[in-house]
Amino acid sequence: MKRIAFVFSTAPHGSASGREGLDALLATSALTEALGVFFISDGVFQLLPGQKPDAVLARDYIATFKLFDLYDIDQCWICAASLRERGLENINFVVDATPLEPVALRRELGNYDVILRF
């Protein structure tokens, strides 16, 4: 079975990319357990708690990330450099994601056969 990586690299609510990626991730998790989830660049904002998407007339899909345990999605990484650049090092995110430096993150990403970016 191919290993599939989902990479979230865009901020939430500015486009449908994050929501579509999350929908694809949850659907794919029904077919395989060989999944990895990566949050890089502005994608780290996907995991911030306390977002108010209704203020910009967007759907609140961020709470759906909390379903990772229910879907047995446990391979989750977040870019440590992206967190530092955005001043987010000491935040409790909506999911448990392991911070990795860019070199280690690229190495981990290299273990996947398919990479889908949202």
Swiss-Prot record:
Q: Which InterPro entries match?
A: DsrEFH-like, Sulphur_relay_DsrE/F-like, Sulphur_relay_TusC, Sulphur_relay_TusC/DsrF
Q: Name one process (GO BP) from the record.
A: tRNA processing
Name it: Protein TusC
Query: Which cellular component appears as one GO term in the record?
Result: cytoplasm
Organism, as annotated: Salmonella typhimurium (strain LT2 / SGSC1412 / ATCC 700720)
Organism phylogeny = Bacteria, Pseudomonadati, Pseudomonadota, Gammaproteobacteria, Enterobacterales
SUPFAM superfamilies this protein is in?
Answer: DsrEFH-like (SSF75169)
Compartment annotation:
Cytoplasm
The task this protein performs is described as: Part of a sulfur-relay system required for 2-thiolation of 5-methylaminomethyl-2-thiouridine (mnm(5)s(2)U) at tRNA wobble positions.
Provide the family line: Belongs to the DsrF/TusC family.
